[in-house]
A protein has these predicted regions:
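Short acidic/His/Gly/Ser-rich catalytic and metal-binding motifs that mark active-site loops
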Residues: 67-69, 111-112, 177-181
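N-terminal capping/small domains of soluble enzymes
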Residues: 2-106, 138, 149
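Secondary-structure transition into beta-strands, especially the periplasmic turns and strand N-termini
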Residues: 93-97, 157-165, 190
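Single conserved hydrophobic/aromatic residue that forms the stacking wall/gate
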Residues: 185-196
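Active-site-adjacent beta->alpha loops and helix N-cap segments on the catalytic face
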Residues: 137, 182-183
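Short beta-strand segments at enzyme active-site cores
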Residues: 58-61, 99-103, 163-177
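Generic hydrophobic/aromatic pocket-lining and core-packing "Φ" positions
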Residues: 47, 89, 157, 165-168
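Non-globular sequence segments
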Residues: 104-165
Length: 196
């Protein structure tokens, strides 16, 4: 019995490998960032199941780069967080699927419970304009705050690299801090130009 070769389809290209910078994805199907609240080993198992299911590239949910955006006691800017990264990226990488880690600062879209304020401090944003969704009143950022957030992005990205992540995706939409700085609603034009 002979088998006939499969008839080519318009979707065949989806299964071809693709290079994005230095990252080689197995195919053109990727798992986008979405929130899953699991500890690192369980999150790693969750992502690996998606790798087994056929995705060629994984983007994790967002990890916060600074205390003013932090939640749930996770401190990605601290060097010890590299071990957590290793725990959730390694299972997928063993299957040949690269993992990109999303990093973010929520800015005016941040939320705070009373215990969060005591532990992490106030929500920070370019101006004192609350998000229409979360309604937490942000504290306007000073230059030192901006510098600290930049350092938080750098430290978190370094931890991703140290933990074996294949890259980072910076999330700046949805009213988060980076989009706050680009919005004329949140800041004046001279301030926006200084920020850029």
């Amino acid at each position: 019995m002979t088998t006939q070769p499969a008839t080519p389809t318009a979707l065949d290209g989806l299964w071809e490998p693709v290079r994005i910078g230095s990252v080689q994805a197995l195919n053109r199907i990727y798992l986008p960032a979405h929130q899953v609240s699991l500890p690192p080993p369980a999150y790693g198992a969750y992502l690996a199941e998606r790798a087994r299911g056929g995705v060629g590239l994984i983007v994790t949910h967002g990890f916060h780069v600074h205390p003013a955006s932090a939640r749930a006691g996770v401190s990605p800017w601290e060097p010890a967080w590299a071990d957590a990264v290793r725990a959730f990226v390694t299972p997928s990488k063993r299957l040949g699927v690269p993992v990109i880690v999303q990093v973010t600062h929520m800015g005016a879209s941040g939320t705070r419970r009373t215990d969060d304020i005591a532990h992490w401090g106030a929500v920070l944003a370019p101006s004192q304009l609350a998000s229409p969704v979360h309604r937490a009143m942000p504290q306007p950022m000073e230059e030192d705050d901006i510098r600290a957030v930049i350092e938080g992005f750098a430290a978190t990205c370094a931890n991703v690299q140290a933990g074996g992540g294949d890259g980072v995706e910076i999330h700046g939409s949805h009213g988060y801090l980076l989009s706050n700085f680009l919005s004329l609603i949140h800041i004046s034009e001279p301030t926006r130009q200084e920020a850029i």
